[in-house]
Every structure is written in structure tokens, then in C-alpha cells.
Amino acid sequence: MTNLRKTHPLMKIINHSFIDLPAPSNISAWWNFGSLLGICLMIQILTGLFLAMHYTSDTLTAFSSVAHICRDVNYGWLIRNLHANGASMFFMCLFLHVGRGIYYGSYLYKETWNIGVILLLTVMATAFVGYVLPWGQMSFWGATVITNLLSAIPYIGTTLAEWIWGGFSVDKATLTRFFAFHFILPFIIMALVIVHLLFLHETGSNNPSGINPDSDKIPFHPYYTIKDALGLMFLLLVLLTLALFSPDSLGDPDNFSPANPLNTPPHIKSEWYFLFAYAILRSIPNKLGGVLALLASILILLIIPFLHTANQRSMMFRPISQTLFWILTANLMTLTWIGGQPVEQPFIIIGQLASMLYFMLILVLMPLAPLFENYMLKPKW
């Protein structure tokens, strides 16, 4: 069996990726989230496949088909709850994974990082079109508000929005194509994940110290397979607790009402994992400006590798950068809170200040702090 594992063309790839892979001996639990994301993707694809067997992408029957899944299909309620809350777990792991990359300087593996940002955007697109499918009030109005942002693009905006809609508003054609996108995108994500891992295995993993770990590597199996299994147990515990005890706690009550184009909900908001970007979008009174800020809030990740000014890779030994990182984390939590609040004072001004601080931290303060840290590291005698 050992020989087959090392010689068989397919087994050899698996062996080099998950068994005999040399891994740094000191990587912490923050390195668990990559494998957890892979498991989240598998859970989402499997539960989504079973949901697609019973779902109908038609404006007249979409809402009823979701109710039918929850009431009449064997364990349909469980599959649906796992899928809906699995998305929340997916984004939780994604944010922690990206945060780890920023904290420990993993972004210096530029190819891996760039593919990761593309993956983040693709997952966000998948989650957005997926949220529209139950065809509840928030599904419909969320789709209307976000797709309507395309009309802010000069000259071609209105045409582009109508092209996406397949008509003059969000309707049957929109729902059908969103279902098609929601079905195909996870498989595109799987392909991108393989490319992401391919680039990662070219360089090997980073580690908390940020120092080249080549002199001290251990095999991935059994050390990190067992560590990832522990992470998986925690993930499943949280996911099952959510899905079985409070499956609707992260959703919006408005989505229990069927979509009604004649009745606008008092407060349109997205799922919690988009609220930080939604708050940035709303903080700018101009429509095009808001759209550009929304895009910039995610695409800013692409320029982080070029803003690295520190002599050290990781923030592990850089207290000022650490402080700024945790301020950024608190700021993102503030933006998430603001995104869920109505558009009125004092939430408007808090959102504007938090949005400004978000861009200032990443573009100005976090590149400047390491220059001072570099100076402090120089021997003064």
C-alpha cells in the first residue's frame, strides 16, 4: 500500500498534498481554517445539491417549494438549515482565514493571496445570488437594491442592470438565471481552490514567526490531520447547534413573507456577513461613490502585499502593528453593526467615521507603523 500511495499517478498527488506534505512544525490553530473552508464547501455543495432536487426557480412557486422542502421532504428542514447556517460558518472561517493572512504576513505569497481574493469575491457572489432564491421579501428587495447599483455606472449602467435582470425589473428571468449562477459557481470555486492550493504548495506554508521554516518541517499526516480533525469537531458542533436549536437566528424575519414588489420592507439589509460592505456603501451619499467604495473595500486586499514596509514578515513581534490590526478588527465589527441599523443619526455619522478609518488603517497607518518599528529595531550603540 505504501508503494501504491507513492507511485500511483492519482494517489501520488493526494500523497504529496495531504499525507507526506512537509509542514512547518510550529503552525498554530489559525492555520486550521483552510481545511475547515474546504469542508464548508463540501457541506454546501452536498446540501445544495439535495435542495436543488426539490427547488423550483419560478417566481410563482419558489417560495412554496422552499416551504415544501421544510415540511414534506424527509429531513428537508435539516438540509435547508445546514445550508443556510453553513453559509454563515463559511464566511466566519473566511474572515478568520483572511485575518490570519494579514496578521502573519501570508499575503507575501502573492499568487496564493490573489487567488484567495478572487475566491472571496466568488464566494460573496455565490452567497448573494443564493440569498435571492427563497423569493421572500428580503430576497427580492435585496436583489433589487444590489443589482440596481449597476445603474450607477456611467453611460452603460441602466443597460447593464436590465441585461442582468432579463427585463425592466427583478422578475422571473432574474430568479432563473440566479439559480443557474448559484448552481455553477461552487464548482468554479472548487477549481479555484485547487489553483489556490497549487500555488500554496509551490512555496509551502507560512508560520507564526514569519521565519523560513525549511530547517524544521514535519509530515502533514498524522500531525496536522489530527489537528484539523479537532477543528472539524468544533465546526460541526457550532454548525449543528445553530441548525438544530436556533436555525433562523441569523436570518431576517421579513424573508418569511413571500416577495411583494408593491410593499417595500421598512429596512432593507443583507445577511450579516455582507453588512460591513453594506455600511461602507451607505456611508457615501453619492450612488456611484458608494459603489466604488463598496468595491474598494474588498479589492483593497489585492494591494496589501505592496504596502508591506516591515523588515519582519509576521506581526508576532510588532506590537504597534498588532494594535492597529485589532483596531481594524473592532472597526469591521462596528461596520457590521452599523450595516444592520436604520439610516438615521447617530448611525450615519458612526458609519462614515468607521468607513474612513477602515481605509485609513489599511492605506496609511498600517504601512507607516512598521517604518517606526524598523527604526526601533536598529541597534542604537
Swiss-Prot record:
Cofactor note: Binds 2 heme b groups non-covalently.
Name of the gene: MT-CYB
Function, as annotated: Component of the ubiquinol-cytochrome c reductase complex (complex III or cytochrome b-c1 complex) that is part of the mitochondrial respiratory chain. The b-c1 complex mediates electron transfer from ubiquinol to cytochrome c. Contributes to the generation of a proton gradient across the mitochondrial membrane that is then used for ATP synthesis.
Main location group: mitochondrion
UniProt: heme b b566 binding residues: H97, H196
Cross-referenced SUPFAM superfamilies: a domain/subunit of cytochrome bc1 complex (Ubiquinol-cytochrome c reductase), Transmembrane di-heme cytochromes
Transmembrane stretches, start-end: 33-53, 77-98, 113-133, 178-198, 226-246, 288-308, 320-340, 347-367
Positions bound to a ubiquinone: H201
Subunit structure as annotated in this protein's UniProt entry: The cytochrome bc1 complex contains 11 subunits: 3 respiratory subunits (MT-CYB, CYC1 and UQCRFS1), 2 core proteins (UQCRC1 and UQCRC2) and 6 low-molecular weight proteins (UQCRH/QCR6, UQCRB/QCR7, UQCRQ/QCR8, UQCR10/QCR9, UQCR11/QCR10 and a cleavage product of UQCRFS1). This cytochrome bc1 complex then forms a dimer.
Name this protein carries in UniProt: Cytochrome b
Cofactor dependency: heme b
A Pfam family it matches: Cytochrom_B_C
Binding-site list for heme b b562: H83, H182
Subcellular location: Mitochondrion inner membrane
